Amino acid sequence: TRGGRAVDVTPLWTVDRPAALTVSAAGLGTTTNTEGGDVVVTARFGSLAASAAVRVVFAYTVVAPGAPADAPAAFPETATPGTDAARAPAWVYPANETVFPQNVYKVLFQWRRGTGNDRFRLTFESDRTRVSVVTDGAHPTCTMAGTGLGCFEPTLDVWRAIAAANPRGSVRVTLDAASSTAPGTFARASTLNIGF
């Protein structure tokens, strides 16, 4: 109140990354469920302004086209990787520490499948992101090449969820492999780091 009269002091809320977070007129922040990352939230009233940094951690699992809907069951959260070297997948592309432009999403991840594996999980993880993709490893390019490799190419939405949340940063990429005939046990490749 001022002079016994109520005065409206509702601030104007803004964010610098509305693709990750929106703020209502009442100041309630809501994630968009499309990407994560660091967001600066600012409240302005007249000539006054205050800002705060908010970190949005985006986590979700995608079942890639071609993989059965129950494919994630091959990788229970409570399981740990096995030690059978013959079953372990191995990265072919990209090389560790590869840096990609954020707007180039047609990256074809490629790996040796390991013995008996037909289910694969790629997890892209940082302090802002945890995106898991479960796939059967089939891709037309790899099939045509006849190499027998497992492959995955992110869609634009998946790539944006990974890259936009980590500008000038990096993510760890883990690759797990399992067999549909023995769900619950899986093997893991060495971890990759990729940057943007």
Where are these regions (language model features)?
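Extracytoplasmic soluble-region selector
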Residues: 1-71, 117-119, 161-162
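Solvent-exposed loop/turn segments flanking beta-strands in beta-repeat/beta-sandwich domains
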Residues: 87, 113-133
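Extracellular fibronectin type III
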Residues: 182-194
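Short, aromatic- and glycine-rich surface loops/edge beta-strands on solvent-exposed regions
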Residues: 37-45, 166-179
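Contiguous beta-strand segments within globular domains
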Residues: 87-115, 151
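Signal that preferentially marks extracellular ectodomain short beta-strand elements
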Residues: 28, 139-170
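Proline/serine/threonine-rich low-complexity linkers at boundaries of modular beta-sandwich domains
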Residues: 61-88
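Short acidic/polar inter-strand loop motif in beta-rich domains
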Residues: 48-50, 177-185
